[in-house]
UniProtKB/Swiss-Prot annotation:
Keywords: Iron
Any single GO CC term annotated in Swiss-Prot or TrEMBL for this entry: cytosol
Recorded GO MF terms: iron ion binding
SUPFAM superfamilies reported in the protein's UniProt record: YggX-like (SSF111148)
Record GO biological process: cellular response to oxidative stress
Keyword Transmembrane helix: no
HAMAP family documented for this protein: Fe_traffic_YggX (MF_00686)
Protein name: Probable Fe(2+)-trafficking protein
Length: 90
């Protein structure tokens, strides 16, 4: 059986990640408080931001920018999205 977490983004119990997505305290926080669904959605948003804004992940400022956008995404705060992106209708 998969583990569940109380997801920070969706404010309900959902399937959790199998392992922390990154090392350190930030990875552990995501592992304990973010659902698999929210993480997968963030990965899609992150990819669009990297491509749209031509982010170089070797640049510490770009990594800090993505970290800040990730926090905003998981906390349901306004976050930058790719220009012209229209979410699919559900």
């Amino acid at each position: 059986m998969s583990r569940t977490v109380f997801c920070r983004k969706y404010q309900k119990e959902l399937e959790g990640l199998a392992m922390p997505p990154m090392p350190g305290p930030k990875g552990q926080d995501i592992y304990e408080n973010v659902s698999k669904l929210a993480w997968e959605e963030w990965q899609n948003q992150q990819t669009m931001l990297i491509n749209e804004k031509h982010l170089n992940l070797m640049d510490v400022n770009n990594r800090k920018y993505l970290q800040a956008q990730m926090e905003r995404f998981f906390n349901n705060e306004p976050f930058d999205q790719a220009e012209g992106y229209v979410p699919p209708e559900k």
